[in-house]
Amino acid sequence: MSMSANTMIFMILGASVVMAIACLMDMNALLDRFHNYILPHLRGEDRVCHCNCGRHHIHYVIPYDGDQSVVDASENYFVTDSVTKQEIDLMLGLLLGFCISWFLVWMDGVLHCAVRAWRAGRRYDGSWTWLPKLCSLRELGRRPHRPFEEAAGNMVHVKQKLYHNGHPSPRHL
């Protein structure tokens, strides 16, 4: 039950990331570029936009190799083989959200494997000591106290008085 809840959480997180990208960037420009430059290369030699988004308009498609072609969209309109621009944009957005969601689920699995490995080997191995410091929010704000060095290279140990909860006293620095 908890695995499916985690999967749903990461799916929702992936959809939120896609929505944030769409709000922060000009997603229409990205989808228009995909629609006008990439799809004509995939559809054939004539480089015609076979969509019905503008039947009576002339589409100027400039491919990457530099030729410029002017095509009347009303001559190349196919009812059965065409997919509208909105459907392509929807499929592209869903695919992007799906990929981001599965990436987040994979990252969740990697983190769980790392935590399991750390818990299994923490008594015997010191290589996973960074993980609890990384995951602990309480330790995130604290700076590690390092001993100061004198100019001669001798170590000077600074002794601080601490409160009962482990925080340094501001009066005895």
Curated annotation (Swiss-Prot):
| Matching InterPro entries | TMEM240
Q: Which UniProt keywords apply?
A: Cell membrane, Disease variant, Intellectual disability, Membrane, Neurodegeneration, Phosphoprotein, Spinocerebellar ataxia, Synapse, Transmembrane, Transmembrane helix
GO cellular component, alphabetical, reads: cerebellar climbing fiber to Purkinje cell synapse; parallel fiber to Purkinje cell synapse; postsynaptic density membrane; synaptic membrane; TMEM240-body
Q: Which residues carry this modification: Phosphoserine?
A: 169
Establish whether keyword Transcription is in the entry.
Answer: no
Asked if the keyword DNA repair belongs to this entry, the reply reads: no
Where does the protein end up? Synapse; Cell membrane
**Transmembrane stretches, start-end:** 5-25, 90-110
**Membrane-topology annotation of the record:** Multi-pass membrane protein
What family does this belong to?
Belongs to the TMEM240 family.
Query: In the record, what disease is this protein associated with?
Result: Spinocerebellar ataxia 21: A form of spinocerebellar ataxia, a clinically and genetically heterogeneous group of cerebellar disorders. Patients show progressive incoordination of gait and often poor coordination of hands, speech and eye movements, due to degeneration of the cerebellum with variable involvement of the brainstem and spinal cord. SCA21 is characterized by onset in the first decades of life of slowly progressive relatively mild cerebellar ataxia associated with slight extrapyramidal features predominant in older patients and cognitive impairment predominant in younger patients.
Q: What is the official name of this protein in its record? A: Transmembrane protein 240
Gene that codes for this? Answer: TMEM240
